[in-house]
Amino acid sequence: MSCLKIITLFLFLAAVIASSIANQKGKHRVGAPEQINPNDANLKISLAKAISSQNAGVVVVKITKATRQVVAGFKYVVEFVAKVAGTNKQKVCRTVYIEQAWLKKTSVKNFSCK
């Protein structure tokens, strides 16, 4: 085997091993859901759009958990505490929606409060 082939094989194996180690350490993978900061201003805006489209009659008190995934747009899964409008009663809610900014469209796939 020529020296060039041996070096190429070595570099290829080193790249495969490095990639494997990075994936094992929890690095973000393309297309996988990623945790996002519940205080993110863009998250709050997009969640408000999703809630208003449902006529849910709730006001967000606190976002407790949120993920975002690149699909045909951004898929959000958001868990939050909400207050029923006009009362002090609070509920725990969860919604899944897809935001397609270039179409100016937000599609709610699931919305529930308990």
UniProtKB/Swiss-Prot annotation:
GO terms for molecular function: cysteine-type endopeptidase inhibitor activity. SMART domains: CY (SM00043). Residues 31-109 form the Cystatin domain. The keyword Lyase does not apply. InterPro entries: Cystatin_dom, Cystatin_sf. Residues 1-18 form the signal peptide. GO terms for cellular component: extracellular region. Belongs to the cystatin family. This is Cystatin Pr17a. The keyword Cell cycle does not apply. Disulfide bonds join C93-C113. Expressed by the venom gland (posterior main gland) (at protein level). It is found in: Secreted. Keywords: Disulfide bond, Secreted, Signal.
